[in-house]
Amino acid sequence: MSGLFRGRVMTGLNVRIGQGYDVHAFGPGDHVMLGGVRVPHRCGVLAHSDGDVILHALCDAMLGALGLGDIGQHFPPSDVRWKGADSGVFVRHCHLLLRERDWCVGNVDATAICESPKIAPYVNAMREGIARLLEVQPECVSVKATTSEGLGFIGRGEGLAAQVVVLLYRLNGVVV
């Protein structure tokens, strides 16, 4: 059984998993974008686009599951078109890529890693917004937060990060 798949490209599977990570340093501003939601904060983030770490990590997770590189390859920071761009544009692009390849989003599990801002009051809006972008039900999207317990650049309040896992599926080759 161990040699059953040796030398074969596993393209016939009906499930794929992708993982994404993004990080941004804090900078001037009065809010951060997280999961497509404007969250008031003592500062903004240093980024070429709107710097939404959750949506950027979501893009990388989808692109990774599809084997299509990363967000920087699709939306290079050197391209002036993406200066200050709404990260929802990036998510819609990645979602279109997966739909064109007959994949659907099964679920999204996102974790924001930050000492501040506190995101609990905004989680439902994030879940609903991400669900709309991906054309899934909000219960298919989890958004939560954790801290780094005061350790590292996040613990010192210098920035924030996010990790996202996405499950893609095909239902007997039929797109739903």
Curated annotation (Swiss-Prot):
Gene behind the chain: ispF
Annotated residues for binding of 4-CDP-2-C-methyl-D-erythritol 2-phosphate: 22-24, 48-49, 70-72, 146-149, 153, 156
Cofactor (UniProt): a divalent metal cation
Stated family: Belongs to the IspF family.
Source taxon at top rank: Bacteria
Subunit structure: Homotrimer.
UniProt keyword annotations, A-Z: Isoprene biosynthesis, Lyase, Metal-binding
Molecular function terms, GO-annotated: 2-C-methyl-D-erythritol 2,4-cyclodiphosphate synthase activity; metal ion binding
Function: Involved in the biosynthesis of isopentenyl diphosphate (IPP) and dimethylallyl diphosphate (DMAPP), two major building blocks of isoprenoid compounds. Catalyzes the conversion of 4-diphosphocytidyl-2-C-methyl-D-erythritol 2-phosphate (CDP-ME2P) to 2-C-methyl-D-erythritol 2,4-cyclodiphosphate (ME-CPP) with a corresponding release of cytidine 5-monophosphate (CMP).
Record's keyword annotation contains Heme: no
Cofactor mode of binding and number, as noted: Binds 1 divalent metal cation per subunit.
Matches recorded under NCBIfam families: ispF
Catalytic activity: 4-CDP-2-C-methyl-D-erythritol 2-phosphate = 2-C-methyl-D-erythritol 2,4-cyclic diphosphate + CMP
Pathway the protein takes part in: Isoprenoid biosynthesis; isopentenyl diphosphate biosynthesis via DXP pathway; isopentenyl diphosphate from 1-deoxy-D-xylulose 5-phosphate: step 4/6
EC number, UniProt record: 4.6.1.12
The protein's name in its UniProt record: 2-C-methyl-D-erythritol 2,4-cyclodiphosphate synthase
Site (Transition state stabilizer): 48, 147
GO process terms (BP): isopentenyl diphosphate biosynthetic process, methylerythritol 4-phosphate pathway; terpenoid biosynthetic process
Residues noted as binding a divalent metal cation in the record, renumbered to the chain: 22, 24, 56
Lineage: Bacteria, Pseudomonadati, Pseudomonadota, Gammaproteobacteria, Lysobacterales
